[in-house]
Amino acid sequence: RDRSVSRGLGDVYKRQLHTLPAGEVWPLDMVMDMKHEIEAAGLTMECIESVNVHEDIKLGNENADKYIDNYIESIRNLGKAGVRVICYNFMPVFDWTRTDLAMDMGNGATCLSYNGAQIEGKSPEDMFREIDENSNGYAMPGWETERMGEIKELFQKYKGVTEDDLVENLRHFLCRIAPVCEDCGIKMAIHPDDPPWGIFGLPRIIKNTADLERLLSLVDSDINGITFCTGSLGASKDNDLPAMIRKFGDRIYFAHLRNVLRRDGWFNETSHLSSDGSLDMYEIVKALYEL
């Protein structure tokens, strides 16, 4: 089967589209401007990371279908530009979470790290203040200063939302967009939860093999696929990454190859050398190559 390596363009092109709030349509003219600039640099625009999913879709409230309609329009516009894969996530409130954005590695380098003990018993606002003071000028997606005012309100909205509720809301989202994706030739590649366990009492539904099996059962369409992020899934020692690649290989449409060093209750990101972390990067790449 012919495979190509796609690069997520959310990190390549951030001058315009990243300023659009989650839930707004990505206008065709802005998408085409992005396409032309990328192609002028000798690249091909095949994969977009990320078209963010509005919280009302995840909550499944009365506004959900309005925002799904907007998402569908964005899919159509990206399809017209030749995009074949959209990376997205279904994590409530926050995107990926770390407790230190500039941990000293002791060799002149810094890295992202997560320490579960620093989160226990703290509110998101308290954690934000700590991270902001020690972030070396960096920020996490979803943890931007301007969003802090709405965090308490969002947590109230998620009170009582269970894992099963979130799964059902994901199913509804995928059922709505699947026919459009099929028409446009676009695959959806969900990003795993990062870290792959619950934080702040919020439900998490893309953490392990069982979750991925459930995901693929929600919609009977090959548009429903996976972004295989080794750093996210690999933060849990219970995830056998090469085995997961072999199991879900025909639904892996995009991959993030990252290594992490795990310790009890926390982890940090590290170089791609297997010897520098807890992941066997050779076996991971070998499993992907053999698909």
Language model features with spans:
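Histidine-acidic metal/acid-base catalytic patches
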Residues: 39, 56-60, 65-69, 76-84, ...
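Active-site-proximal loop/turn and secondary-structure-junction residues that shape catalytic pockets
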Residues: 18-19, 51-52, 90-94, 192-198, ...
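Short beta-strand segments at enzyme active-site cores
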Residues: 46-50, 85-89, 186-192
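Glycine-rich, proline-tolerant flexible connector loops at the mouths of alpha/beta enzymes
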Residues: 16-32, 200
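Active-site loops and adjacent core secondary-structure elements that bind or stabilize anionic groups
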Residues: 12
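A short glycine/small-residue-enriched secondary-structure motif
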Residues: 42-58
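Active-site-proximal, glycine-rich beta->alpha crossover segments in alpha/beta enzymes
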Residues: 77-171
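Single conserved hydrophobic/aromatic residue that forms the stacking wall/gate
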Residues: 2-9
